[in-house]
Amino acid sequence: SPYFLYRMLRRGGYGFKLYYRIGLFPIIPKKTDNKRIWIQAVSVGELSSLAKILDTLLQDPDLEIVLTGTTSTGLRMASDKYKGRVLVHGPFPLDWFWFSRLAWSRVRPDLIITVDSELWPEHFYQASLRGVPALIINARLSDNTFARLCRSSLARKLLLPKGLEILTTSERQCARWSEV
């Protein structure tokens, strides 16, 4: 909602590269035969948990990585560690239809990856519209989110599209995701 946009700008840090947040990613090189992976790691914690996987992916010359984040500290870490190694890095677009659709038209990924407990309904919707596989790595459900998803089939439908692949961190989390 406009309220959250206002809060982001007022709070500081989140207004950094606002054009990314409204889907206006910079000119991204034309799509080649290489596979393009869009990785969304919200903050320093998610980016750190993804480091080994990301470093391995970056060694493959047939892959192009678009790396996005949400927090100012996560974006700073992404810039410090991956600038020049990924195709593009910057803020994740706000999860609203127009912004997401615009970002997707520019990024054109072959796979999307999110980390931990981040559920981005519009991002996942855009993936399903385009037949792009979506993957959550280190997937976790808090007690509250688990309870809400168990109670609401609408929430499950909006947040968990068909074909979403989920890699969990424990047997308990695996059981929770399976139940949902």
How should these model regions be labeled?
Residues L5-I27, K31-V180:
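Active-site and donor-binding regions of nucleotide-sugar-utilizing enzymes
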